[in-house]
């Protein structure tokens, strides 16, 4: 069995019951004594030495170690699992604990029943379920279900093909003098020139968490092309073009074209 995280297993012998502990490999995680104690207590073991268990875990390095936890032969028990969910309810992990000597592995039906008990209804990772038919990793959080995040909506985008923020600067004449009366407040435009292009909004798509609850997407900002005289709007409502030669300006979101310079 391939593994990285440290794990433990109950071994039942003729002279009593033992706990086998296996060291982590590479960058695997060490066992948390609280997890081991909680498991043993849930299985009905009492009277074992927590200090001895702690010392055993501290000594655990490259080879597995064994500690006796009871002088009696425990009744065999099957593999078990717990379900752990993320705070955002978008992912669920399954954490397996090995069967004792003589115990059985969980079946696919039992694993699915465990998910159902925890009300995990959406996003079960079938490739993981398939792998669990032949492979086990213990004391390790294995992703078993994932929610679907909402697809963000996108706002309408309007692109203008002229200077929408002209600078009110005086015009410099050929002789070097300055004409303060001729301020450049307009942009010249020719007949047929594109003035503005609209990219429609994308409504996005709602998501769903592992409990089957819909997650709404954000609301997009929807805009339309606004325009005055001397301008043509395309049939699909996405393009403005000038009908005349003149000046173009943008005022309060509306495009205006004047046929006089």
Segments the model singles out, each with a brief description of its role:
Residues 1-261:
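Long, low-complexity, mixed-charge
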């Amino acid at each position: 069995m391939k593994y990285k995280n440290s794990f433990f297993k109950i071994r039942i012998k003729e002279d009593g019951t033992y706990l086998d502990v296996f060291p982590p490999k590479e960058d695997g995680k060490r066992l948390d004594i609280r997890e081991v104690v909680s498991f043993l207590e849930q299985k009905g073991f009492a009277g074992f030495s927590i200090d001895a268990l702690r010392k055993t875990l501290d000594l655990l390095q490259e080879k597995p170690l064994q500690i006796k936890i009871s002088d009696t032969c425990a009744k065999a028990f099957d593999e078990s699992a717990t379900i752990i969910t993320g705070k955002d309810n978008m992912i669920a992990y399954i954490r397996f604990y090995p069967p004792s000597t003589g115990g059985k592995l969980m079946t696919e039906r039992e694993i699915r029943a465990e998910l159902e008990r925890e009300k995990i209804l959406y996003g079960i990772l079938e490739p993981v379920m398939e792998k669990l038919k032949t492979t086990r990793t213990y004391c390790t959080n294995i992703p078993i279900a994932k929610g679907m995040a909402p697809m963000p909506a996108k706002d309408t985008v309007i692109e203008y093909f002229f200077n929408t923020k002209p600078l009110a600067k005086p015009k410099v004449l050929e002789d070097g003098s300055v004409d303060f009366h001729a301020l450049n407040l307009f942009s010249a435009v020719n007949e047929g020139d594109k003035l503005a292009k609209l990219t429609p909004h994308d409504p996005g798509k709602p998501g769903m968490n592992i409990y089957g609850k819909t997650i709404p997407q954000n609301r997009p900002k929807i805009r339309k092309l606004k325009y005055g005289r001397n301008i043509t709007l395309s049939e699909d409502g996405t393009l403005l073009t000038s009908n005349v030669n003149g000046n173009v300006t943008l005022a309060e979101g509306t495009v205006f074209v004047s046929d006089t310079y």
